[in-house]
Amino acid sequence: MEKKVQKLHDKKNIALVAHDNMKDPLCKWAKKHSFKLSAHQLYATGTTGHKLEEATGLSIRKCVSGPLGGDQQIGAKISEGEIDILIFFWDPFEPMPHDPDVKALLRIAAVWNIPVACNPASADFIISSQYINEEYERLVPDYDAYIAKRLG
């Protein structure tokens, strides 16, 4: 697939998602980094978003809860260019009834070349990156070229 450059602004759109057993670690992480996070637009799935607002006092744009379609809503926002970074604390020890949704979310993040953190250590690396508060150019699929080629 052909690629094109997409410019990210210094204020990023960051999605925060966590499975049930990982909501507290995500809230703890977000509270620790609330100053840096406050410079960005934050999104979350439903329950996680409410817990994050309570823990940090930050404003969060909330989708529905993950098992009710929130993971898919976040994925749609990624494919529409509305999410720049995904912080997704998932529990590797718990079977997930909505596992296909989780796999789809991670696949979409990979397709659209967005940074993904799956635990506090990887999230620390992203939030402390020099690019978090700077403009950044990334390669994304060129959908217009894709359609033109398909309709050719």
Curated annotation (Swiss-Prot):
Reaction(s) this enzyme catalyzes, per UniProt: dihydroxyacetone phosphate = methylglyoxal + phosphate
Any one annotated GO CC term: cytosol
InterPro entries linked to this entry: Methylgl_synth, Methylglyoxal_synth_AS, MGS-like_dom, MGS-like_dom_sf
Residues at the active site: D71
Alphabetized UniProt keyword annotations: Lyase
BP term (GO), one: methylglyoxal biosynthetic process
Coiled-coil ranges from the UniProt annotation: none
Keyword flag Lyase: yes
Binding sites annotated in the UniProt record for substrate: H19, K23, T45, G46, T47, T48, S65, G66, H98
Pfam families (UniProt xref): MGS
Domain MGS-like: residue ranges: 6-152
Annotated family: Belongs to the methylglyoxal synthase family.
Function in brief: Catalyzes the formation of methylglyoxal from dihydroxyacetone phosphate.
NCBIfam families, A to Z: MGSA (TIGR00160), PRK05234.1 (NF003559)
Name of the protein this chain belongs to: Methylglyoxal synthase
Lineage: Bacteria, Pseudomonadati, Pseudomonadota, Gammaproteobacteria, Cellvibrionales
Gene that encodes the chain: mgsA
